[in-house]
Curated annotation (Swiss-Prot):
Taxonomy, superkingdom: Eukaryota
Lineage start: Eukaryota, Fungi, Dikarya, Ascomycota, Pezizomycotina
Annotated protein name in UniProt: Imizoquin biosynthesis cluster protein I
InterPro entries: MFS_trans_sf
Regulation: induction: Expression is down-regulated by ralstonins, lipopeptides produced by the plant pathogenic bacteria Ralstonia solanacearum. Expression is positively regulated by the imizoquins cluster-specific transcription regulator imqK.
Pathway: Secondary metabolite biosynthesis
Residue ranges with Polar residues bias: 1-15
Species for this entry: Aspergillus flavus (strain ATCC 200026 / FGSC A1120 / IAM 13836 / NRRL 3357 / JCM 12722 / SRRC 167)
Length: 105
């Protein structure tokens, strides 16, 4: 070793840097050195913002539409399945199933 030749020491497998570091946000390249990987939005502040009025308006209208649909589907099913002039099962306003559920008429 006194000849002045450069020596390279290869680390033993137990001394190498792990491929995935624990929580440091870096990764090891082939040489064993750690390279820091950053995400594109790491430096951007996160600020909570309110939703625009148009989003609230569309959501409210769609919710009302769903309530109206599911609220009318049961009476409409009665009117569609049972014809008006059927003597066995008078449907519609023939005063059977719909007036038993909703005694308003």
């Amino acid at each position: 070793m006194s000849s002045g030749e450069p020596t390279t020491m290869t680390p033993s497998p137990s001394e190498r840097t792990p491929l995935l570091s624990n929580g440091s946000g870096g990764a090891a390249d082939d040489g064993g050195t750690t390279v820091t990987i950053s995400k594109p939005n790491d430096g951007v502040r996160r600020i909570a913002d309110s939703l625009p009025l148009s989003v609230w308006l569309i959501s409210t209208i769609e919710l009302c539409e769903r309530f109206a649909y599911f609220g009318t589907i049961a009476p409409m099913q009665n009117y569609i399945q049972n014809p008006r002039n059927d003597p066995l099962r008078p449907g519609g306003i023939g005063k059977t199933a719909s007036t038993m559920i909703y005694p308003a008429v």
